[in-house]
Swiss-Prot record:
Cellular location(s): Mitochondrion matrix
GO biological process, one term: iron-sulfur cluster assembly
Record's keyword terms, sorted: Mitochondrion, Transit peptide
UniProt name for this protein: Iron-sulfur cluster assembly factor IBA57 homolog, mitochondrial
Organism: Mycosarcoma maydis (Corn smut fungus)
Transit peptide segment: 1-108
One GO CC annotation: mitochondrial matrix
Length: 403
């Protein structure tokens, strides 16, 4: 059994404040440590434009005991030995991002592993930041491999809260840099941490507290997937979920559950589908010029979870129009807010998207238009996919015919 304790949530829900500034990509400064006092925190907030949000749908599980490193090293996709201060000659990082896979190589959940001060006996004590909707099943999965290992699992979801801090272009205030860790998933996503109520109040003094929905919007517009909706349990692959691009996979570490398929996919270099951000719009209207063109007043419902996104050739005279395969499903919608979202799409089709209203006939050659049905079951939404700027530029785009 895992124990639960109650604690008052220090981040009360506040009205969403959407502005173009908070949607722009941030320049993240490497993490450094500063002293923190109440006066410095107050000074931070005076000039800071940083945002702080409680991350929605995240739970916290403590893993402690002398076999913690060994157990998790065999279960997650990244090298957690980097967190083990007992075996390193240098200061270890405070956080590692990774994924849990089942034996078939399908992803179960994403996880942030946060290093905490060791137990009195010197054994590790780590906090797992995972989706609260899959927490029970993931704990059960870990226990299958725990066996007689000297490891204790404790649900601390009511004692600790997962928070994210970010800004458009400035260096993190000292309080944020000290209390949180750089989120490795993308250069613009910000800082992340698991904090107690008192620690959150300290960090909140150096930033503006915003609604969790604003963090979700920031994450989606930066093309960063997270949680149970974007990573359907036991049905998606870690590389399709961009775990490799988000520094969540170490291909040099030894075996772990699900490693064989992940390694084989990496070494063949063929990943046909990946999660990308989308902008939604209606036929007869111009597509958004940027993923950051967010419309909080978008009047239509977004698609249902895992709704099929289809593509069709824009030009009926193109060679593609004669091939039925070009009209097949392009991928599936995973999550969204307002008029933006994320979807796992075929890259070969993503690169062929074009604006059907373009006056240039050359731009329509072999080009595709993407559409998906709204949750109301009647409205057809057009979708414009985007390739995040932080993706590696030397990655090939495989054809649907590649073997």
């Amino acid at each position: 059994m895992i124990t639960r304790r109650a604690l008052v949530d220090p981040l009360a829900r506040q009205p969403l404040k959407t502005s173009t500034n908070i949607l722009r990509a941030a320049s993240i400064i490497p993490r450094c440590t500063f002293g923190s006092t109440a006066s410095s925190a107050a000074a931070d907030k005076t000039s800071s434009t940083w945002k702080l949000a409680k991350v929605p749908h995240r739970g916290v599980v403590q893993v402690s005991g002398r076999d913690t490193v060994k157990l998790l090293q065999g279960l997650v996709s990244n090298d957690v030995k980097a967190l083990d201060s007992t075996t390193l000659t240098h200061q270890p990082p405070n956080m590692v991002y990774a994924g849990f896979m089942n034996p078939q190589g399908r992803m179960l959940a994403d996880v942030f592993i946060h290093r905490q001060p060791a137990n009195q006996d010197g054994s590790p004590r780590w906090l797992l930041d995972i989706d609260s909707r899959t927490l029970p099943s993931l704990v059960a999965f870990i226990k299958k491999f725990k066996l007689r290992s000297k490891v204790k699992l404790t649900d601390l979801s009511t004692d600790y809260h997962v928070v994210q801090a970010w800004d458009s272009n400035s260096q993190a205030p000292p309080t944020i840099a000290e209390k949180l860790s750089i989120d490795p998933r993308s250069p613009s996503i910000g800082y992340r941490g698991v904090l107690s109520a008192a620690e959150i109040l300290d960090v909140a003094a150096a930033a503006s507290t915003v609604d969790g929905l604003e963090y979700t919007l920031h994450r989606i517009t930066n093309g960063v997937a997270e949680g149970a909706l974007d990573f359907p349990q036991a049905s998606s692959l870690p590389l399709e979920n961009n775990l490799d691009y988000m520094h969540g996979v170490d291909f040099r570490k030894g075996c772990y559950v699900g490693q064989e398929l992940t390694a084989r996919t990496h070494h063949t270099g063929v990943v046909r589908k990946r999660i990308v951000p989308l902008s939604f719009y209606l036929a007869g209207t111009p597509p958004p010029a940027s993923i950051h063109d967010v419309d909080p007043a978008f009047p239509h419902q977004l698609p249902t979870h895992l709704a099929e996104i289809r593509s069709k050739p824009i030009s009926t005279a193109s060679e593609a129009a004669t091939k039925p395969a070009r009209g097949k499903a392009a991928g599936k919608f995973t999550s969204g807010v307002y008029n933006v979202g994320l979807a796992c799409l075929r890259l070969e089709q993503v690169r062929r998207w074009a604006d059907s209203s373009s006056a240039d006939p050359n731009s329509k050659h072999d080009a595709l238009e993407f559409s998906v049905l709204s949750a109301d079951g009647e409205t057809t939404l057009l979708a414009r996919p985007w390739i995040p700027s932080w993706w590696p530029h030397d990655q090939p785009v495989p054809s649907d015919q590649d073997t």
